[in-house]
């Protein structure tokens, strides 16, 4: 299932690189979704801006997917992927619904859901980054990245899909809890710390 997702994403992304009309037809766009083209909520996840964007998303997906596949199996893996994909774009839609020109592509929501599901299942998993070679527990990264995404979404000073990351992350967390409710007891504090920034962000917005 993982390699099928990767293959489809690569093939469709390459098609989008070469064919601008294809790219524009299937990318996420607020006005188009409002006009009934709901398929863009899904199709946009298989398109990417360039090879760097494509590589980063798929590399991240590869790093975190096996943990979920081994722990939960292929069916639950695809459920997490698809639900996170949709809600990453849905969260983006709600965030930018008054900006009809807003467009986005990429599997960021789906990948983010997989990443945060893996973090919830394996919070002590060590992560090593090129610019930060010291092994870091995944839960530290998870909390930090949510805070960074909320900050980035508020600042609106880059081209990163922070809202898709956030929507995908919260979806991945919730679906993982539904699939494996015992995690509420074993990871109570981690769940609280991961969800708290969303609650604060909603409260500040109001």
Residue ranges, per PLM feature:
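A detector for small-residue-rich transmembrane helices and their helix-helix packing motifs
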Residues: 1-206
């Amino acid at each position: 299932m993982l390699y099928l997702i990767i293959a489809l994403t690569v093939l469709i992304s390459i098609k989008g690189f070469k064919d601008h009309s294809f790219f524009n037809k299937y990318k996420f766009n607020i006005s188009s979704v409002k006009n009934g083209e709901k398929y863009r909520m899904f199709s946009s996840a298989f398109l990417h801006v360039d090879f760097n964007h494509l590589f980063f998303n798929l590399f991240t997906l590869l790093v975190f997917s096996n943990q979920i596949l081994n722990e939960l199996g292929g069916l639950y893996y695809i459920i997490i992927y698809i639900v996170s994909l949709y809600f990453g774009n849905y969260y983006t839609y709600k965030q930018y619904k008054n900006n009809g020109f807003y467009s986005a592509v990429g599997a960021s929501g789906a990948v983010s859901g997989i990443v945060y599901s893996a973090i919830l299942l394996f919070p002590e998993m060590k992560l090593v980054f090129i610019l930060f070679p010291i092994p870091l527990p995944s839960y530290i990264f998870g909390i930090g990245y949510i805070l960074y995404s909320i900050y980035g979404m508020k600042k609106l000073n880059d081209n990163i899909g922070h809202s898709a990351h956030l929507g995908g992350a919260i979806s991945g967390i919730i679906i993982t809890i539904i699939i494996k409710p015992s995690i509420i007891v074993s990871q109570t504090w981690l769940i609280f710390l991961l969800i708290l920034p969303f609650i604060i962000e909603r409260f500040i917005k109001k």
